[in-house]
Amino acid sequence: MKNKIYLIVSILFLSVTAISAQTDEEKQKLSIFSEYVKAKNYNAAYAPWMELRLASPRINKAIYVYGERILNDTIANSEGEEKIKYILDLLKLWEERRTVFPNITPQGAYLAKASQLKYDNQKLLGESKEDLYTAFDAAYITDAKTFTNPKSLYTYFSLMVGLYDSSLKSAQELFSKYDDISEKIDFEVKNYTNKRNAFLGEDGEVLELSRKDTSRLKSYNSYLRAYNQIAGSIDTKLGSR
């Protein structure tokens, strides 16, 4: 009986030791690739990042935040089949993020990012205009609230115009989508204007802000400039149709 108890205790001790050692190793890999990413040494970051991504996908959101930066850099410095491989892996990474961290991965935002990535590489990936529009449309229908990227909203409407010009969409569908996107832009302009104004005084002067709030204000102003630009671009794109 004593021997059995000793054996059980020994097994438990070895298991805990192994888990602890594994956790320490994972933390070390996380620290290593994180520091490489911060230094923008993406080539060095790739191997430890990929090892940890495959072994422990739930350990930390940095796998997905920094992983996106790593793959974007790899895509930018690749060509042909190799570039396609990394593009597809980035799309896969976003899917994994939605599975592992759904609460911090808004569907509309990430489906739009995936659609934009496909659009930006449509020739390389062999994507048709119809398939691209369907992808953007699915993102918008699924979660319009977080589909806020100005560039993607413009791309979405631009694809609709292209399909209309190819007689694949009706005039009613075109103008309905124009109204839809225009209303979305108006809503987001009001949204970001309110966010920006929270950092301004009564006379419009910028209040004394923390570094974090200064960064937020810069982001809000950037969004407002982008929305103003695409609002005009959408009108131009529609033209006399």
Regions found by a protein language model. Give the residues of each.
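Bacterial Sec-dependent N-terminal signal peptides
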Residues: 1-26, 68
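Preference for long, solvent-exposed alpha-helical segments and helix-linker "stalks"
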Residues: 22-241
